[in-house]
């Protein structure tokens, strides 16, 4: 907190951004994960509709939703339609492999349930939802990612944001950020916001670390508020719009 109080204003513009592990995964959850739920896909409201088997991300991106992780915040033995939860590989090396499917939307799509039907309680009708959703480890270390970034923003801690679930357009505040200069973390900055489109950003991820961490949250949707995990290793988006209080 003291570091941020002394920080200068973040410059704005398009630049590489290194997003640290853990809660950084909220961007994938919000801007991409909801678009992989069958409740959106079956109605044609998702940018991922009819794209199974197609390249939807860079080859470094493998995304998983796993409701079976022991003691994880979003885990459960069976979903709210009585189907056993499972490990669902959504995107593998950039290729769209699966959606999160409940029984109702599965019938519409001619697909089997993936154990992804959830609701807050009996007052809500269950529908397809995420459990523990994360981007898997990649081949790089965080140190390598920083060292290979000549100039950019290091988003160490992410804050809140807003998303248009139909398009994946998002903006998220950076709670703790630093300028990367000459492959090294330099001065702290404040007032940074990441602005982009989730499905497009997936193609811009060009380095993925090996330090996967998960963070806990509550996800609200038509079937109520449910516990979910988000997660990712440190990763680099080679170009994203950074909104800052300081113009270039």
Where are these regions (language model features)?
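N-terminal small-residue-enriched
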Residues: 1-248
């Amino acid at each position: 907190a003291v570091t941020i109080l002394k920080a200068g204003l973040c410059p704005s513009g398009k630049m590489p951004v290194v997003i640290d592990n853990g809660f950084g995964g909220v961007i994938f959850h919000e801007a991409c994960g909801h678009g992989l739920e069958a409740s959106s896909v079956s109605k044609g409201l998702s940018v991922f509709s009819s794209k199974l088997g197609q390249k939807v991300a860079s080859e470094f991106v493998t995304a998983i939703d796993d409701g079976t992780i022991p003691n994880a915040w979003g885990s459960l033995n069976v979903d709210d339609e009585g189907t056993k939860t499972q490990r669902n590989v959504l995107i593998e090396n950039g290729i769209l492999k699966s959606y999160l499917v409940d029984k109702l939307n599965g019938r519409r799509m001619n697909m089997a349930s993936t154990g992804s039907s959830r609701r807050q309680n009996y007052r809500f009708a269950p529908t397809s939802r995420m459990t523990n959703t994360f981007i898997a480890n990649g081949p790089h270390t965080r140190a390598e990612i920083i060292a290979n970034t000549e100039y950019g923003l290091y988003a160490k801690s992410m804050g809140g944001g807003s998303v248009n679930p139909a398009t994946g357009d998002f903006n998220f505040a950076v709670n703790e950020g630093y300028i990367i200069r000459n492959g090294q973390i330099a001065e702290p900055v404040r007032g940074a916001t990441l602005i982009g489109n989730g499905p497009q950003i997936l193609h811009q991820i060009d380095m993925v670390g090996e330090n996967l961490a998960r963070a806990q949250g509550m996800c609200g949707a038509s079937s109520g508020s449910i516990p979910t995990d988000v997660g990712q290793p440190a990763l680099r988006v080679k170009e994203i719009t950074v909104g800052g209080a300081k113009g270039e």
